[in-house]
Amino acid sequence: MRTVTWNPEVYGRYSGERSRPFVDLVSRVATEDPTRVADLGCGSGSLTAILGERWPDAAVSGFDSSPEMVAQAPTDLPGNVTVELGDIMSFDASGYDVVVSNAALQWVPSHRELIDQWADTLASGSWLAWQVPGNFDAPSHALMRSLAESAEWRERLGGVLRGPEGVDSPVAYAQRLQEHGFDVDAWETTYVHVLAGADPVLGWVRGTGLRPVLDVLGEADAPEFERQYSDLLREAYPATAAGTLFPFRRVFCVGRKR
């Protein structure tokens, strides 16, 4: 898996829009008294705090592989919440009552096998819940891939970006959990964000999907790629007096082990 460098400040510019799927996800985890809760790919832990507030008697652990993100963990986290460096691929689900992952598994090519592993490991009555972006066919990502594979950029960026095959449908994820003895609630939602400012879609993807490109190109060449990419985005997502409409599909799966 390619290592991605994260910029907490850039990622956090749309924190309100990014937090809503997390809240929608965990609202479907219908348990009142878990003892141990894990948040995988927690970033700075600002959303992990929600889990600590919801389950004040649980030990809530947030894990993220980005030192930059973990270093930005809020100083006022609930006392039952910790945020630490940890790799999703080496996470051991043993002993956890709730395992949550929000907008992280799409970065892990082997995440399907990890889901199988966690599902086998979790005890009866435990919960496994995740959300992944399902917008890899959207113009924001399709145009990025097309530009990266163009003659000008292919030599440096060919194969850097993931395609739609990186995540599954709600049905496929539901079937996967059912095979491991889970009762499943799976769905998809398209959030239509109204973004303000100049080139807001570029500003959004700078914090997530564009990171692999920026890491490869570096400060010398990234601005030229962004210039070409932003021209394409303005046509695909025209600005209006009320803002720029940015549809964003997300895929959710929540399961309780019987």
Q: What is the role of each PLM region?
A:
Residues M1-D33, A38, S46-I50, M69-Q72, ...:
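Conserved class I S-adenosyl-L-methionine
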Residues R36, S126-W127:
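Short glycine-centered segments of the SAM/dcSAM-binding site in methyltransferase folds
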Residues R36-L40, S44-F91:
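Class I SAM-dependent methyltransferase SAM/SAH-binding core
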Residues T3, S44-S46, P164-R258:
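Conserved Class I S-adenosyl-L-methionine
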Residues M89-V99:
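A short acidic, Gly/Pro-enriched loop at the edge of an enzyme's catalytic core
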